[in-house]
Amino acid sequence: MSTSVFNRRWAALLLEALTRHGVRHICIAPGSRSTPLTLAAAANPSLVCHTHFDERGLGHLALGLAKASTEPVAVIVTSGTAVANLYPALIEAGLTGERLILLTADRPPELIDCGANQAIRQQGLFASHPTLSVNLPRPTPDISARWLVSTLDSAMAQLQHGALHINCPFAEPLYGGDEQQYADWSASLGDWWQDCHPWLRQTCYPPSLYQPPAQQADWFFWRQKRGVVIAGRMGAQEGRQLTAWAAMLGWPLIGDVLSQTGQPLPCADLWLAHPRAQETLAQAQMVLQFGSSLTSKRLLQWQTACQPQEYWLVDSAPGRLDPANHRGRRIICPVGEWLSRHPAQRRTPWATELAAYSESAQAQVIETLAGQFSEAAVAHQLAELLPDNGQLFVGNSLIVRLIDALGQLPAGYPVYSNRGASGIDGLLSTAAGVQRATAKPTLAIVGDLSALYDLNALALLRQSSAPMVLLVINNNGGQIFSLLPTPEAERQRFYCMPQDVNFEHAAVMFSLGYARPNSWPQLRELAHQCWLRGGTTLIEVQVPPSQGAETLQQLVQQVTLIPQVAP
């Protein structure tokens, strides 16, 4: 009897079981040991197959698909170091909640630790980072199909947040054989193959997941007090809902760039440095934080130092999510559901002077950046480049901080990022996944080192189903280190690491459009044409190396000198 045929039957059942739990997208890297899984995925009509030759980028492609679709996404890789390359995306998913199913092909047990080629210890490789791990046995007809499908159903039913690692050993041969063999093994599941439901419909009942969020009994008391709302990472609908809710309460809302609230008090990273603004905020009796992953340095400093009578943090993700370790309440539930069960009461705003400080800070930004074509100016005016009915992917390091501090994005406009572990690896791949999941026009903005780090992901951008612009802000190195007290003598060589490159030839290599504008009107017109023309265009903006960091530091100092506003 054929080992290769049974491997494929085993893999076909595995993939079909995953589709019963909402898996539609599967990302596949080349490899021989993973052949049973790859062929099963290709043959399954319920799956959309994505391919990439780099497993690190493949993991991030899946991460982007999961972010934008809010569905579980599967990944197939071969054995050996291919598996280890999934680590960064797995870590990010664990911190930000995207559901990934990592199907890692493996050598059978007798080939581990004996010098066999491409055989490493894959069981437990990811340590505590996966939410769940399943180590499957080598496929054999001695194990019933019911056991395999029940094992997978149980694991998928438990997967609410983060990654599931399924290690899949396969013995050779991997190719050929009579496809009619072992049909009775698959047929033992009867009419399940014609069904669309899991074999085992397991229901999980952790309270925060199956019950609507219980109303805080004292909410009607606290909503009459002076409160401040902090908005971290959340969805577009939640951002709009929170903005209206806070406005009705009369509570100031300090919105992160990822909050999608429209940042009703823009330039918070600047005006939060003003002593009088801090004095006003100190009068808050309650702070309500929705979402995590705050970007602004000044907001994080205030969030750490504030001492309200009550501090509540609402987010659907598990964990504490509060590095300041406030005494208060950690409420695990979706933001929108919590808001619906805790109605606002219309009240007169109690901290109106904050709006004046915000307006003054924004005016200072406009005055300082007038006539500039710079990193800071692009961050400030980024909203003008956004496509209608599109989405934005924001990179890490300096650019996200500049957009957070100087820009103001439209309320409810979809914004994606990798702000869990905040690495610069895999950003282009993640942006490609976001675009593929939604087929919306997409603007992605990253720095030059981020683009270099994931350069081969430009291959993924060739397959764009909607217009896409990759905006690379080339400040020649990791200029975020110019914001930090790094030793000046060693800063360039050991921290910023300038590479003195441009991206024109990279765009040509991957058959992408390319442009390098020299002014803001030119950039704005280029972006507009890209949305009309379609395809993917890499737009490179070359700027003086440390100007963005220096401008931000200068603006913080200028805003602290704004005259006091009368309450």
UniProtKB/Swiss-Prot annotation:
Binds 1 thiamine pyrophosphate per subunit. GO terms for molecular function: 2-succinyl-5-enolpyruvyl-6-hydroxy-3-cyclohexene-1-carboxylic-acid synthase activity; magnesium ion binding; manganese ion binding; thiamine pyrophosphate binding. Pathway: Quinol/quinone metabolism; 1,4-dihydroxy-2-naphthoate biosynthesis; 1,4-dihydroxy-2-naphthoate from chorismate: step 2/7; Quinol/quinone metabolism; menaquinone biosynthesis. Pfam families: TPP_enzyme_C, TPP_enzyme_M_2, TPP_enzyme_N. Belongs to the TPP enzyme family. MenD subfamily. The keyword Manganese applies. This is 2-succinyl-5-enolpyruvyl-6-hydroxy-3-cyclohexene-1-carboxylate synthase. InterPro entries: MenaQ_synth_MenD, MenD_middle, THDP-binding, Thiamin_PyroP_enz_TPP-bd_dom, TPP_enzyme_TPP-bd. GO terms for biological process: menaquinone biosynthetic process. Keywords: Magnesium, Manganese, Menaquinone biosynthesis, Metal-binding, Thiamine pyrophosphate, Transferase. Homodimer. Catalyzes the thiamine diphosphate-dependent decarboxylation of 2-oxoglutarate and the subsequent addition of the resulting succinic semialdehyde-thiamine pyrophosphate anion to isochorismate to yield 2-succinyl-5-enolpyruvyl-6-hydroxy-3-cyclohexene-1-carboxylate (SEPHCHC).
